[in-house]
């Protein structure tokens, strides 16, 4: 598994739309995106001077994106949204390890926010040593000190 995390590019719009328009992918996130909303997301979150999200690739193929940005003064929020064909194959776990390492190198603790019903994310967070800290804006918050 050779996963690359890189800055988003304008050319990611089609693959990002495929991801964000999929109702299965978006089940616990938001309503599926149309093309225009995907473009706004790409420009505001992925192409910003300080991005909130980054593309994830394996072997040069887009597999989804990761969330990596400041959560508060001491923490980075991490997460991932992957195409369904990459679910259950260890990609989220490997990406989580990479993002934890990046945050640790920056001297930060790590937070994952997710819908409480998102069993796979909750399972992965607990498996990686995150502790449930409560709810914020309808999302369960897990923290790795």
Language-model regions, residue ranges each:
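Short, charged/polar low-complexity linear motifs in solvent-exposed/disordered segments
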Residues: 33-35, 44-46, 81-83, 95-96
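Acidic-histidine catalytic/liganding microenvironments
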Residues: 22-23, 48
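Acyl-donor (CoA/ACP) binding surface of acyl/acetyltransferases
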Residues: 1-14, 19-21, 55-145
């Amino acid at each position: 598994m050779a996963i690359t995390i890189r800055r988003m590019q304008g050319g990611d719009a089609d693959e990002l739309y495929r991801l964000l328009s999929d109702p299965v992918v978006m089940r616990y996130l938001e309503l599926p995106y149309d093309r225009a909303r995907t473009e706004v997301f790409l420009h505001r979150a992925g192409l910003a001077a300080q991005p909130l999200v980054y593309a994830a690739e394996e072997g040069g193929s887009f597999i989804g994106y990761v969330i990596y940005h400041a959560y508060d003064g001491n923490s980075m929020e991490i997460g991932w949204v992957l195409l369904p064909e990459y679910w259950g194959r260890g990609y989220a776990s490997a990406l989580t390890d990479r993002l934890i390492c990046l945050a640790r190198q920056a001297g930060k603790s790590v937070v994952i926010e997710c819908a409480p019903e998102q069993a796979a994310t909750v399972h992965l967070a607990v498996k990686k040593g995150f502790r449930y800290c409560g709810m914020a804006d309808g999302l369960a918050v897990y923290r790795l000190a």
